[in-house]
């Protein structure tokens, strides 16, 4: 993986941990998340502090060596764009038959030996998430990555439903792409209460950091903790009740 230099910190790092920007015809620095747009680009570390610094100190003008405007709400914009990319990747994986949702289907996928990534809604109950993460660790020998950065409604969008608590992706390209976007999103998004789940996972020998995960596609991402409400769920009814407690008629 090539390294790029962040305009905010001056530090170099892997390109998949930074975000590329290009200059539009009207002089605006716009994010190029896929790093495919033509023209000269500058790179920014994928975290909120770097984005705030780049806006405040007008670092894009310095990086492009010309006057460059940028969205004042850049950190929030980048968070939204990264969430949208993650939803899109999960949706593509679903259409390719490489992603499932629903508690039972997720458990089955984890036990099948084909799963490369477990995704849990960050506002799902810590107890339910802890149990599913323990299953992933036990069946995958630490090789199944864990992502807990999307809300239940966001995860549901990828599957064409109102919400989803659990999902699993097969090992391979989609899981690798989602893991990369999750690493970048973790610099912008604050996780909901997952401290208990993370602590319990660590107590069971489960890795709490991405660099402790085995395998090229593995990642454990939760982000900083924030005391906020969670979606109530039961272990066997997690994807049948919504955040408001209303019942679902399926467990797709």
Residue positions per predicted region:
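Conserved nucleotide-binding/hydrolysis micro-motifs of P-loop NTPases
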Residues: 13, 49-51, 123-126, 153-154, ...
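Helix-rich interaction surfaces within compact, conserved domain-sized segments
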Residues: 147-200, 220
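Short helix-coil boundary/hinge micro-motifs
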Residues: 5-8, 114, 130-144
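Helical mechanochemical/support elements of P-loop NTPase systems and associated helical scaffolds
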Residues: 2, 41, 56, 82, ...
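N-terminal cysteine/histidine-rich coordination modules
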Residues: 1-66
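Extended interfacial segments that mediate partner engagement and assembly in macromolecular machines
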Residues: 49-128
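Catalytic cores of RNA-modifying enzymes
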Residues: 2-8, 33, 76, 80, ...
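Charge-patterned, long linear interaction tracts outside catalytic cores
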Residues: 197-252
């Amino acid at each position: 993986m090539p390294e790029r230099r962040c305009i905010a910190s001056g530090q170099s790092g892997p390109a998949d941990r930074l975000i590329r920007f290009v200059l539009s015809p009207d002089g605006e620095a716009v994010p190029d998340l896929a790093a495919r747009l033509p023209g000269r680009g500058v790179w920014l570390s994928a975290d909120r502090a770097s984005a705030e610094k780049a806006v405040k100190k007008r670092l894009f003008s310095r990086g492009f060596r010309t006057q460059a405007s940028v969205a004042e709400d850049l950190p929030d914009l980048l968070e939204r764009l990264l969430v949208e990319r993650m939803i899109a990747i999960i949706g593509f994986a679903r259409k390719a038959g490489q992603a499932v949702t629903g508690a039972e289907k997720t458990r089955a996928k984890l036990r099948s030996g084909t799963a490369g990534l477990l995704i849990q809604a960050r506002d799902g109950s810590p107890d339910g998430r802890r149990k599913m993460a323990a299953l992933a660790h036990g069946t995958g020998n630490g090789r199944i990555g864990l992502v807990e950065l999307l809300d239940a409604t966001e995860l549901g969008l990828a599957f064409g439903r109102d919400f989803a608590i659990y999902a699993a992706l097969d090992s391979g390209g989609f899981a690798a792409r989602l893991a990369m976007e999750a690493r970048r999103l973790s610099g912008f998004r604050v996780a909901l209460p997952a401290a208990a789940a993370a602590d319990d996972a660590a107590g069971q020998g489960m890795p709490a950091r991405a660099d402790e995960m085995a395998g090229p596609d593995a990642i454990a991402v939760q982000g900083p903790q924030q005391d906020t409400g969670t979606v109530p769920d039961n272990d066997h009814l997690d994807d049948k009740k919504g955040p408001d407690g209303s019942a679902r008629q399926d467990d797709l």
